[in-house]
């Protein structure tokens, strides 16, 4: 069973690599090597890196040697682990956060992967501005697009929903809960972000394809596409006053770089490599671009470079003479979100077990906060804690807590909380590790947390809701899979990514089933926690991230 669509460009980029001579690695046929490359790209590279040097996941080079600060050395590698041990790890997962692949890959594929990762990593080709230009498709020039909204849909309450394994995006009308349109996009769209105007949806696929969708047509229409590289995760527009939607930035995992485009046509303008030194002073050949966000304080983007731990503030006022401020934080930067004041961006340095906070006004690191294992905020959640004032919350992939960090506020009534700022003020207990996303809304008194990566079905298929008025109370568990009314399936149906509607009174959860199983979007009333609606449709296949236009446009969380 192989996951299907992977864009031809991304695949040919990876498959173009020749077979190298291997010492000590088990024999493989050419066909097995091709299968290994495809599965590695689709399933493994995100955590372990194309060059397999490790980040969220472990180093998977055939042989590695580490020298500690005290001069002692440690050696290891996939060759040392051998095929049998690797098959076990891939099949059953590990306590360190690696999920079990025995319900995703066949036995033969697990065996192929166990042998493939004992080979020297294949290095895919680079991707230049010329390659980007060649991939650029302007399907509808800006002056030929509608001059006003041509439909009657309340665009602010539209949800863009990733249909992960189909290479498609569903646009659902949040008012009527009807599917408005399902569009082709890149493979396994990672995130959708909105234009400052709320008219356009930008999506980026894992295969590096950016799709620009115009919501003003009778039905949503793709007006431009462009490739950023072979593997990407992030995209955002310029949002500062006077620059709204003028530019778009996209970050790639491979090659490690970010690209700047025209915001309305996607015309490629510039590529900047992120290769360089880590905060520990070592050169890294694959420092991937993780989250990117448009600053509210200045005409800048916050670009988080995973492996180096460097946070770049990219000033977009003069693209030809680009100025960048590079802020040292901690290695393995991943996802993050704004604090309540939208002055500080908090980003997880996940495998360093830290949260880094950037002050976008001063352009400096505001804090580096130690947390429990592998924080994974998504965008996090902001609320006023009854005892500690404004806090930002993150869940953890690697531990059974939700961490609450006190954040600064210029409001007079919050002055008394200053002494707590940048401290972990509370850790809410969860039923286990494996959380990916937490969410709340300014109008809500609830904090929602999923647990899709927990190995227990009863946790992975449920969400937990905390009462913000009394955080010492145990959370309410909602069994999303059961509430969907769908029959139980062999593969886990992971309940993930709570997202509010525009009004802030409903929470939408993805019930992410196997590729051939019926999945669903399950909607709850935020006040009563009662089931409100289940959206099932043969087109809703492997739904994951959901992005409400208004909340994404205004960073409401
Ligand atoms: Fe994500 C955000 C990277 C796996 C769903 N994910 C992000 C961001 C990064 C990232 C860098 C922040 C983007 C930004 O804000 O600019 N994700 C990665 C990986 O490297 C990783 C671990 C492995 C991979 O191969 O991609 C990974 N992510 C997943 C999944 O398996 C998820 C659960 C399902 C899916 O669709 O692939 C998933 N990631 C998401 C979602 C967001 C996200 C829904 C956006 C959260 C938000 O609310 O903004």
Say what each PLM segment does:
Residues 46:
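Short, cysteine/histidine-rich loop/knuckle motifs that typically chelate Zn2+
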Residues 21-27, 31, 50, 84-87, ...:
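Predominantly soluble domains enriched in secretory-pathway, periplasmic, or organellar proteins
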Residues 26-37, 53-91:
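Gly/Gly-Pro-rich "capping" loops immediately C-terminal to redox-active cysteine motifs
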Residues 54-64, 88-120:
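Axial heme c-ligation environment in periplasmic c-type cytochrome domains
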Residues 1-21:
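Gram-negative bacterial Sec-dependent N-terminal signal peptides
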Residues 41:
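Residues immediately within or flanking Cys/His clusters that coordinate Zn2+
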Residues 55, 69-70, 99, 168-171:
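Short, solvent-exposed loop/turn elements at domain surfaces
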Residues 67, 95-97, 275-277:
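A short, flexible beta-alpha/helix-coil linker loop
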